[in-house]
Amino acid sequence: MRQGVPTIINPYDLFALEEALQVRDRYGGEVTVLTMGPPMAEQALRKALTHGADRALLLTDRHFAGSDTLATSYALSQAVAKIGESYGAPDIVFTGKQTIDGDTAQVGPGIAKRLNLQQLTYVTKIVSIDPTSRELMVERHAESGTQMLKSTLPCLITVLEGVNAIRRGSLDDAFRAAGSTVLKWGAADAGIGELTKCGLRGSPTVVKRVFAPGPRAEKAMQMDINDKTLAEVAADTVTAIFARQPVLERKLTSHGNL
């Protein structure tokens, strides 16, 4: 149910927006913000304009209802391609690392795949961009540490949270946003010809219900570690675990792991 619920910009996308604005301020160009959603999503796009974006576009159509990440990435990729035809091909497509509702982190890479763009995920810093050679260097967060990656333009970058300080936007930006027209495209406007790839028809996954998990029936157990060595605490912990999971103890014992 969306009725009565205000729309917001996905928090991770705010960092992507700021990164795009910084690139524009340093190297020139324009920043176009794009989202897919119901008509009420216009207010979130207008908020992006107050931060300094040059253009806002809402992809909205009944054909998009019920889209999963596969259908969403298809529709957005077609819209990005159409934006390229109308306003010039983008050198960099920025997205947040993921959305706060689905948490899949699949849409950004999905767009890159469909548009045949180089993709740089979990980026923490854009080190440099060379407009002449059309190359850029970024820092990327990885489980093993930080990676330095070099890529060519055009590319798609998914941005991690906390990589920048999101600007408030000037008073002029606020007035401009209030008077700006948020472009609205339906499926036909975006050049989407294969409607079977959109919405529920184009979605292999279907959300049956969304719910908040209830509290666990099991209670946490507080252990007394006063005057005990680390070895004794470890032994007590293992004993407590095996008391609650005897099957685990039998399996470990039978395999000679204890």
Model feature map: region roles:
Residues 54, 91, 154:
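Conserved acidic residues
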Residues 80-90:
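Glycine-rich phosphate-binding loop signature in dinucleotide/nucleotide-binding domains
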Residues 28-32, 55:
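Residues at the starts of beta-strands that form the adenosine-phosphate
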Residues 13-24:
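Histidine-anchored nucleotide/phosphate-binding helix
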Residues 125-258:
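Electrostatically charged, flexible surface regions
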Residues 42-79:
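A glycine-rich helix N-cap at a beta->alpha junction
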Residues 102-117:
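Short Gly/Thr/Asp-enriched flexible loops that form oxyanion-binding sites at enzyme active sites
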Residues 2-15, 226-228:
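Short, glycine-rich nucleotide/cofactor-binding loops
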